[in-house]
């Protein structure tokens, strides 16, 4: 062994060996239990950040641990390679997105290798490669023919700068998440997945996911949003509208129908269009409504506005005429684009009615008789739907509880054919059309005679041309006749290819399954390989993907199951959502009102005795800087740490050790230079300890009966540590406590008697085990140490150390001794010592004698294995 720990040399040697021997290649083996560990694959943005390092280290620790336990481990890696950033980079740099993407992939791959991850690179995939998206297109055509994918006009968020449709989640405070432009509403033809057909399965199967965080399951339940209610039909008031018809709404509160005082419709509703004819003010208001976001979150936050159409509908039970209002909070793409308003018992309607002086009719009161209704001030009980309330001012329905009123009113609506009990979901069908270039082409041909025709399987893939430089004004594909001009597969006539591409969430919804057989060119997945590897045993990624990616992947798994491609119902058996990597931020205010963010390494800090920052100044000019607080590492706040620079200074193992030791995986990890230095010191100490042992010469075997008390104590500590670390890695997934346990073991090693042949033999046992225990976290240094401890053997070929149960049986135990409840000393007795022998040993302790002050013992309490309390 080298005298000093040299991360660069140690890590290069291990990585070269692993690469040369294809150490992490996974092959199906029915004779062994499998373990599929997967990190959410990265977008090839150019460089890894510390969030990536933490995510992939967690997965790698679990994969390496399971390998030691004898599992056949698969840990693949690939690239979520389509997407808008590549187009933006292309426009900025004047190159094709493909070239930018492939260059980034090559660089990031070297970064991943430098971190020592146990990846099977033979299974690498990139979603922008035709051999990948070909199968996505194949599934699209299958689902289109089955009706699971359909086309319809949809109201969407349109970003006028990026010239594309945005998902609701890409709209932040009414603006596009990338461009910052005010989002408009537009109605365009789009392709949709009928994810709503799977809503009940997606909801029910959450109960099967015992290995998922409850928080994520709750978020998905809320997103799917199952509710029970009723469709309610309000017939048109022909006198005001001019013709017969009906307005249908869905409500979860039919019990409050008697309190409906108006209805509200979306700006795109036919009644709004009719009323706006010849009404300039209403036309202007409708135009204003159409310029906002269609995201529910944005609608919930914005000021509620409305305008009376002058039209009316008829209340289905009372026959009253109710005014029809256009309101900006009603979305055309949701349900019927209309809602019934019960201002007395819905907070949003309450605010709206008070703003526009609309009637507020109370139809619910507290069953206890307490509480007066105040139409000017909202109170929580107004919206209650439980046994605490009963109906009032509701005619024949008066005095009913929530459920009784619910059932009675729906019954009467059904009898009059003006309503129907209904279960509904908040979940909406998934619109996947994107007016973008760098994505998977939608495999549809538009024929004037035959309509929309799926591309035949023999003609797949529809290949995306890669030598294109977008200009930002719409999709380049729509300007390329060489791409879109084609012939109809049915009639042979002139036709046009679809120029929209798919939402990039489609690619990331099935990649985990493709890893089972990435080179299969006859099917989307090889059924035999998929049945061996799937489900993914452990999926690791950020909680920001709790809803969309994870919901879409669950949906796709069910689609593939229904196509006979996979056998299971769910893709991911266990899910670990790691916390963010955060760091201090520093800045100076600039004259233009913006902030100049200063990198932490350029700041000199002054701290108080408790470690709190009391002053900060710039390293260059010595002038003060503002402490901005702890935030997620990001380019925008200039508080990131470049993994590559870090590895060059400290090595990958220090990064891995610090990441796993600084915080439990599910919590945020605060970056600490002192913590990094501490991790580096520990690895140097580990190396030095092993080197000193190895340099002392060959170790002879020993018999357990030859051990002295110190050596027995060390073996007791060792085998207890093996037990604990296995539990920390496996069941608890708390890697910081596993590291702490090994540190404690090495502290015990330093204090133990490791002299002589027997002492050195015990030392060898401890160091071998400690090396194996730490190897999932710091694999390079452990590989180097193992080569020195056990020449001619390979660490990767070893098994997890076995617990010697005999070592955990102590022949002697230490008991604390108290006098009148106060600790006065300790005694060592035989583990099987009788009560009177324990009492005698305690009474004979010199410090105990001193504090008994010659008084007789009134009572002696022995707590087995723990303490003796003498009462005088």
Swiss-Prot record:
The keyword Aminoacyl-tRNA synthetase applies. It catalyses: tRNA(Leu) + L-leucine + ATP = L-leucyl-tRNA(Leu) + AMP + diphosphate. A motif ('KMSKS' region) lies at residues 632-636. One of its GO terms (cellular component) is cytosol. ATP binds at residue 635. A motif ('HIGH' region) lies at residues 42-52. GO terms for biological process: leucyl-tRNA aminoacylation. Coiled coil: none annotated. It is found in: Cytoplasm. Keywords: Aminoacyl-tRNA synthetase, ATP-binding, Cytoplasm, Ligase, Nucleotide-binding, Protein biosynthesis. Its EC number is 6.1.1.4. The keyword Protein biosynthesis applies. Its main location: cytoplasm. CDD domains: Anticodon_Ia_Leu_BEm, LeuRS_core. Belongs to the class-I aminoacyl-tRNA synthetase family. This is Leucine--tRNA ligase. The gene is leuS.
